[in-house]
Amino acid sequence: MSKVIGIDLGTTNSCVSIYERGESKVIPNKEGKNTTPSVVAFTDKGEILVGDTAKRQAVTNPEKTIFSIKRIMGLMMNEKNAKEAKNRLPYHIVDRNGACAVEIAGKTYTPQEISAKVLMKLKEDAEAFLGESVVDAVITVPAYFNDSQRKATKEAGTIAGLNVLRIINEPTAAALAYGLDKKEAEKIVVYDLGGGTFDVTVLETGDSVVEVLATGGNAFLGGDDFDNRLIDFLVSEFKSETGIDLKNDVMALQRLKEAAENAKKELSSAMETTINLPFITADATGPKHLTKTLSRAKFEGMIDDLVGETITKINEVVKDAGISKGDIKEVVMVGGSTRVPLVQEEVKKAFSKELNKSVNPDEVVAIGAAIQGAVIKGDVKDVLLLDVTPLSLGIETLGGVMSKLIEKGTTIPTKKSQTFSTAEDNQSAVTINVLQGEREFAKDNKSLGNFNLEGIMPAPRGVPQIEVTFDIDANGILTVSAKDKASGKAQNITISGSSGLSEEEINKMVNDAEAHKEDDKKRKEAVEARNAADSLAHQTEKSLSEMGEKIPAEDRAKIEAALNDLKEVLKDESASKEQIDVKVKALSEVSHKLAEAMYKDQNAGAADGGAEKKKKDDDVIDAEVE
């Protein structure tokens, strides 16, 4: 098996790691950084930028710069969180077969395709660092991701050209990185607050076993929400001062987002910061500037209810684990948003103990994913990872009730069967509506998908026996089957849920991504060829001005003609590498006379210098000093 990389595909930033020679280490990207912004931008020239380059141009290109795509991964348009995202994000979120997608310049992209572009960059950076091709990967997801979101994440990996060996939960990966070398069994809590998601997990680690006891969280709570509170405050203050509502100005909103993110970071170490955005907008009276001094206390007042939600969830999860807070040995802080002082204070207060900040909150999840990759590959022996399903799973039964087959907190992989019957006499078909959630009624839970079982033998209601089986694999992805015991008729479905992608569509996206990769490679080669050609043209012009008189007029004319041809092709922005190379070769071939003249001139200069030195030496009179 080739090398296996571990990937933390984050809302704000992503990270990739590799397990080598007994340890897991982060792979820096081509820019030399350990994390890559999860940002994808589409330029007017048709380029696709990923990472830092995409983030840098976001202010000037807000509608075609996609960030926080993880927040709509596997989401249906009719869900509350989708509506919230649509109101918040500057790019266009559209309906694609009922699921969330984004529209860029008239073309629709699924969240899987956008995420795949981030994964492709991580893959390419890993290959450049390792010096070999990489295909196999372990990708992490928030523990509270539902089946649709997990499936969509795996599809993103497939589109990026990766063989996703395993999808594992982020807190579990962090615990694996933290607890691998722990010999004695200890119960720990991983508090994971990232850019867009929150998880809290109680685990038992020790003697190469990492067992999840309970997990919970909110797939729509994170640092982005802290930023949004600050943005709302700035918009409100600006409106009360000027009467102008910045919410209708996408470029202003993008600047506000950047400023809010920076202010949040500054307030993690400073007690006060100033937000200064000159020329944020303009009206009939002229340009307007936004300047606001913000204290840490004011910011904490904006977000205290959000932090409070995470503390409530801590109490629930500890209770689900069947332990008391006194049983917890360590509280491990994971995710960039755990740097916020209020978060640290409240978590510390909740457990009445010092927090464990020994791990890098931005990197530990990827490191754990790489360890899991090494376990699968066989490089790490005797490590047992026991994860759980975060939400209960079941089907809709008579009266719109949810009948649970698998309770939340069940260790995965797992398989469970239950027998149901018909609701009406002589019913020949049933619809199996697969649900995920904790509410009693089907309508209050998430429907992951449904399918029909037909060909049931006619019988009075309650007589037919229909066996429904739920099978969750190690990735937490669900397959459901139904079988009529009398007729033997069976039907099964691997729940695709709201990812909404068929096998054919995924294959098409894989091919499209590969084609774009070729296009990007050609575009990069053309840019490099253009830069080299520009340099050659400049050097040739300089040499002609200095040495042109020292070569025959005929040769000079040929060089000037070839130089003009090269300049002409460089004016064409769409010129390919091959077109540029032809003109570069032509100029190089006719420029040899110029090179000869320069060489002769340099040698002549050297000879003159030597003669001058000799003359000076001849003028020296040897003398002895007594």
Curated annotation (Swiss-Prot):
GO terms for molecular function: ATP binding; ATP-dependent protein folding chaperone; unfolded protein binding. Induction: By stress conditions e.g. heat shock. InterPro entries: ATPase_NBD, Chaperone_DnaK, Heat_shock_70_CS, HSP70_C_sf, HSP70_peptide-bd_sf, Hsp_70_fam. The modification Phosphothreonine is found at residue 197. Acts as a chaperone. This is Chaperone protein DnaK. Keywords: ATP-binding, Chaperone, Nucleotide-binding, Phosphoprotein, Stress response. SUPFAM superfamilies: Actin-like ATPase domain, Heat shock protein 70kD (HSP70), C-terminal subdomain, Heat shock protein 70kD (HSP70), peptide-binding domain. CDD domains: ASKHA_NBD_HSP70_DnaK-like (cd10234). It comes from Campylobacter fetus subsp. fetus (strain 82-40). NCBIfam families: PRK00290.1, prok_dnaK. Belongs to the heat shock protein 70 family. Signal peptide: none annotated.
